[in-house]
Regions:
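C-terminus-biased signal that marks the final domain/tail of proteins
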Residues: 1-115, 204-247, 252-367
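Internal mixed beta-strand/loop scaffold within catalytic domains of large alpha/beta enzymes
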Residues: 102-199, 337-341, 349-351, 358
């Protein structure tokens, strides 16, 4: 690793969008500011759905509207107003149905496929860190966006990395609540529960603590499977493997918890089938090894030492810091697209776009 040393407020390749006001206003600002990126994501997920679920965009849209839109409207009508704003802001013939389809991409595609993300939560003295790499196909980097949102009539502000057109993903809020996400491949699906990316936004917008976040998850349930690493500024944190048939808590040991893309929490029923890639097992084992080594050698958790762990290339190309496998084609061309690190006691974060083992500008988050 050459070291990421250039400090910036914005990334030169991924836009930062500041959104305030009503749900529709937030959506319109989002959509109009990254219109090209929203259209790019529609194009890319049209391809992605064809590869993973063997359906066209039109078929995916019909599935999204018939199975998931009624639930979102019932559980959180304001977020539908925001999605409508995104569609009208992005223009070019996009409709609310298209944006809903983007926001249920996990429910459509990831019951058949999983990406490759590695995440960590670590409590170090008075510091509470969350960190992860987000791995996906290279083309999706062109559709990434950093969203800063201040909803009307709320004292909570949000910062998160997302994909243009998608209302929630990986990030933190000004109350000191943060979340990381790992895809879990499981066929379990319940359209009466909240879709994954809508849930991520709900947590960031309303949870002031770890306990709040757990209560929200329990209240609404997850439409498909996802892993969350959740933490708050008090230092309370844990990993929760969420699924439509139940949630499985993994408590920290030795001051940390690590996860990748397979279920391993206690209590999972045998009927909940898991289909991870082999590298999911090796990546989480390697993250544990690196974390234990640092602890044994007295190396404190900091943004710099976390970045070093997330830059690890042992087992390349399917390493913590991924590179595209030689000869890989289509959706097998996974690579690390971005790294998100958060320290919740100070409500600060550092983000790099690209593989963290390379020399990249650091985007700083604060409130």
């Amino acid at each position: 690793m050459n070291g990421a040393s250039r400090v910036t407020m914005d990334d030169p390749n991924v836009k930062t969008v500041y959104c305030t006001g009503s749900p529709y206003d937030i959506g319109f600002t989002h959509g109009s500011s990254v219109s090209a990126e929203v259209h790019h994501n529609v194009e890319m997920y049209s391809y992605f759905f064809g590869e993973t679920a063997k359906i066209t965009w039109q078929q995916a849209r019909e599935r999204a509207v018939t199975r998931f839109l009624p639930t979102i409207e019932r559980q959180w009508p304001e977020i539908i107003d925001e999605m409508r704003g995104i569609a009208e802001g992005a223009g070019g013939g996009l409709t609310l149905d298209d944006i809903v389809t983007l926001n249920v991409r996990t429910e459509i595609a990831f019951t058949n496929y999983t990406d490759g993300c590695t995440s960590l939560g670590q409590n170090e003295g008075e510091k509470m860190y969350l960190a992860q790499n987000w791995d996906m196909i290279p083309e999706l980097q062109k559709g990434m966006v950093l969203l800063h949102i201040k909803p009307q009539n709320s004292d909570i502000a949000l910062r998160f990395l997302s994909e243009a057109g998608i209302v929630g993903k990986i990030g933190m809020n000004s109350a000191g609540l943060g979340l990381c996400m790992n895809a879990l491949r499981s066929a379990a699906l319940n359209p009466n529960n909240m879709p994954v990316h809508v849930m991520s936004r709900r947590l960031l917008q309303y949870a002031r603590s770890y306990d709040d976040a757990v209560a929200i998850i329990e209240e609404f349930g997850l439409a498909s499977s996802i892993n969350y690493v959740l933490a708050d500024k008090s230092g309370k944190f844990a990993d929760i493997e969420c699924s439509p048939v139940g949630n499985f808590l993994i408590r920290p040991e030795n001051g940390y918890v690590a996860h990748s893309n397979h279920f391993y929490g206690p209590g999972r029923p045998l009927t909940l089938k898991d289909h991870p890639g082999a590298d999911s097992l090796t990546r989480v084992a390697r993250m544990r090894e690196l974390t234990e080594n640092d602890s044994r050698e007295g190396v404190d958790a900091t943004f710099e030492t976390l970045r070093r762990r997330l830059s690890d290339e042992q087992g390349s190309p399917a390493a913590i810091c991924r590179s595209v496998p030689p000869g890989a084609k289509g959706i097998d061309r996974l690579i690390t697209l971005g790294t998100i690190m958060m320290e919740l006691t100070s409500c600060t974060g550092q983000i790099t776009i690209g593989r963290p083992c390379e020399d990249l500008p650091i985007v700083h988050w604060f409130f």
